[in-house]
Amino acid sequence: MRVLVIFIPKSFPNKCLHFKKLGLWIIFQASIKEKSNHQKEILTEQQQQQIINNHINNSISSENLVIPLNNYEESPTQSNISSCYSSQSNLSSYSSTGSLSSYYGSNYYHGASSSSISSINSNIANSNSSSTGRDSTPTPTPTPIQTPSSTPSKKKRSWRIRTPSPKPKLESNNNHHHNHHNYYNNFSEISIELPPTPTYPQKPSFLSNSNQIPRPKSRHSHTNSADSYTSSYSSTYPSSTRSSQKQPPYYQQPINNKNNNNNNNINNFNFNGNNNNNNNNNNNNNNNNNNNNNNNNNNNNNNSNNMKISTSPNKLSNSNHSTNSNFSQCSSSHSLLDTNIGGINVNTQNLVSFTNETSNSGSTIIKPVALKSSSRSVFNSSNNQQYLFSSSTLSSSSSTKTNNNSTTTTTTTTAKTSSTSTNDYSSIKGKSLIDDDASCSISSFNAIEQQVLIPTVLSSSSSSHVMKRSNGSSNGGNSTIQSPSCNQISINKNNLVDIDDEDEDDEDDINGHWEKITIPSNMCRDQISIKNNFDESTKVIC
């Protein structure tokens, strides 16, 4: 520790004032008057010896010791040092310019040889107990002089708390390098037991893509569209086997017509749970038609026949409105709408494929009816009827299931007569769009706008045949054309859309604003073309 001793003249009342400031003890001490030089030297030696002893006890180097420069002679009338702190009024501090001398050293106190702070405190207690009052003029006490310390003391260094080394103690060994490696080897010897790695069974190869069923190899497997995969699946597995298996999902992707030649099944119209088997086997086709008729009677309330026209070609989308028509003995029908003025649109949207069937009585031809609509009305007459199919490229049969579930009827007529197209229907509301003589009827209800069906074409061929619209005669081919029966053509009035709603002029309706063409659920395998005589345009639809 450091002590600053200030010698004050004997006229000062506070003879033993001391305090600690910033870790430095400051002591005010009365001066001692030396009578002779010899006595002065003796006092000086005594002070030096006392300082050295204090230095040894407090572990302070002798370089920090400063010997007092001025030692006043002790007067005979020197007051006793025990007169410190005689009164509280004398403890006020004043500034003075008296003779002061700075002193650096350890615990130094006049008349005491103690080397600790406790000795100073004991002296203060003794001085307070034996203090005597002394009248003297109050003089200001001098301001203590503090000198900055440049070097820290060793005692402060000993106060620092040192954390123990994290390195564990090792057994004494002469080879220090060996001990260094032994320390790190101790950690490597720790064994950590991990749980066993779980083993899972190997995933089968056919379940690599869980969203698809294993794709069978067929002649249509080279196509890139998703609908061709659906058709190849249905054509590979028979209907009896396919009913117990998982059906492929419904795809809504465009169809590449050129890569789907002779694919005679519309799998996107799988509303009844069973599709027509397309193996060109007449017996299987007739059985599947009967199954479709049975399923229509049971599932017509649960299945939807409404589909919207999408902007992309040949893309089907389910409608939010379900068909509520009562199909007694009719198969499911699918509508075809014209979105362009002057004829049926040929932007690969209105292409239809049908099933090739022959009956016992001979080959027949299916003729769908082309309907015109304006202000929610249907106009159809013999002068404006249009035959969409060629007898030379298409043959099919219509099987109508009767009540006894055993007979199959076939109706054949000429091209100039038709049992379903000669009736003039003026309005949709309250009327049945099928002839009264037909074997079934559709319940009437109001038409809903913007609900349109468009079928997807899965087959086409290189042959094309242009049909004319003159009294129902075809451009090439003299064979008879069958008037479609009830199970072949049915009209879904919920899907009729009035394109020309604001125009009430009948003259504009003659321009051939074909709104809807209904087609049967059976499919053909040949290409179909139609011609609209209003604007002399020929468009291929199959």
UniProtKB/Swiss-Prot annotation:
Residues 125-182, 194-333, 390-428, 459-487 are annotated as: Disordered. Residues 125-138, 228-306, 314-333, 390-423, 459-479 have a biased composition (Low complexity). It comes from Dictyostelium discoideum. Residues 202-213 have a biased composition (Polar residues). This is Uncharacterized protein DDB_G0275275. It comes from the Eukaryota.
